Each structure stands twice: as structure tokens, then as C-alpha cells.
Amino acid sequence: MGKTLVFVNQKGGVGKTTSAINLGAYLALAGKKTLLVDFDPQGNMSSGLGLARGLTVYDLLAGKAHINSVLRTTPVHNLFAIPASIDLSGATVELVDEQDRELYLKKILAEVKDTYDFILIDCPPSLGILTLNGLAAANEVFIPLQCEYFALEGLTLLLQTVKRVQSGLNTALSIGGIFFTMYDTRTKLAQEVVKQVTTYFGDKVFNTIIPRNVKLSEAPSHGLPISSYDAQCAGARSYEKLAREIVARDGQR
């Protein structure tokens, strides 16, 4: 059975979508059949993969399409995607009065979960109904953390939400890991944040740190993961290393 990882942080601009795209690409390149699920109405994952307009995850939630008709190929062999569009924002209203409204995505992905080694869900930067769907559908939570003071405050709130989900919606949910993004070696604050979080969370923190890197910012505008855009840059090497770390940890569980 495949493993579903959800990428969550209620703060925007922390590298969540960039991380989901690039880790998905490197997992696929490592021979792991991988599915990326864009569950953010902004659709940044979809545009970052150069996906054309068409059926989206909203059509699945609305019961207008079957998952096989929404699946897309990507520029990377073994990497597939379910795109999103702004229509998904309507689901937050439409699901409010529905029974089991937090379990819609879980039911959709159940049809294909055994087909993939990894499913990666990119949630919006909020803790609303869409993110709850992502948490309910996942085996593990992955938290990208930018190296700044406010990131620590947000982490506390996020972990409280995860605990609430663990106590009801998804008792099997666990913290897959925390990893640092946009790391700038020149700032003392970045070093201090890494030290504090690592001291508190121990082995939940991945060893690999993603540096601040121009190429990582450029790649989405070309509709490519960093592995296809510039595999030799520091950002690419870091995501490849982090993907290997994820696979290694998965093998130990």
C-alpha cells in the first residue's frame, strides 16, 4: 500500500508547494511511482508543473468526474498529478453542510492509493476545511519551516490542529517530519531557529536543510521541477538529498 504525505503550513511563502513539487519529482526519479495532488485553490503546484487547463480536483469533489479522467502526466517519468484551479475555493462553502465533509479527499484517493508508492498533497496556507481533508487523507504530515521567528509561533498552532485530527478524524496520522526551507547561512536568526526546533523536536527534524536559492524560484515559471530545470544547483541537490532521507526513513518504519 502506498503512503500519503500531506504538506501543511498555515503561513504562506514558506516553500510548501516548491517542496511538494520537487520532492515528488525526486521520489519519482528514485523509482517511486508518485502522485502529486494540488489541493490549493491558488493552483501553484499545477502551474509549477506546466499543467494545461482541464478537469481538476474540484470536479472530483463535486462528483463531476472520475479520478482517472483527472490524472495528468508531468515532465518527470513516474510522476503524475491531479491539478487544481480557483474553482476549488468554492468547495469550502459547498462542503460546509455535507456529512463527513472532512473525508471527501480520503475517499477519492482510496481508489488509487495502492497504485502509487507515494501520494503528496499540497494544502492551502490555512487550517480550514481543505487542509482538514488533506490531514484526514494522509498517513504523515510534513511541515516546511522557514527560518524566521514567526515560523515558530505558527508551528505551535499547526501542531495543535494535527493533534485534534489525530484524536478524531485520523487516529493513524503521524508527524512525518519537519524540514527547514529558505535557509540563509548569513543570518544568526536562521541558525538559532534551526537550533531551537531541532532541540525541541529531535529526530522529527530532517537533517537536510533547503537553502535560499534563485533557481528554485525560477523553475515554476518554466513549468518544471528543479530536477528538470537545473539539476546541478544547490537547491536541486538539497531536495534530492531530502527525498533520499524520506525514502530511508520510510524503509525504517
From Swiss-Prot:
Its EC number is 3.6.4.-. GO terms for molecular function: ATP binding; ATP hydrolysis activity. ATP binds at K11, G12, G13, V14, G15, K16, T17, T18, P211, N213. Gene3D superfamilies: P-loop containing nucleotide triphosphate hydrolases. InterPro entries: AAA_dom, DNA_Partitioning_ATPase, P-loop_NTPase. Keywords: ATP-binding, DNA-binding, Hydrolase, Magnesium, Metal-binding, Nucleotide-binding. It is an enzyme of class 3 (hydrolase). It catalyses: ATP + H2O = ADP + phosphate + H(+). Pfam families: AAA_31. Coiled coil: none annotated. Mg(2+) binds at T17. Belongs to the ParA family. ATPase probably involved in chromosome partitioning. Cooperatively binds dsDNA, forming nucleoprotein filaments in a strictly ATP-dependent fashion. This is Chromosome-partitioning ATPase Soj. It comes from Treponema pallidum (strain Nichols).
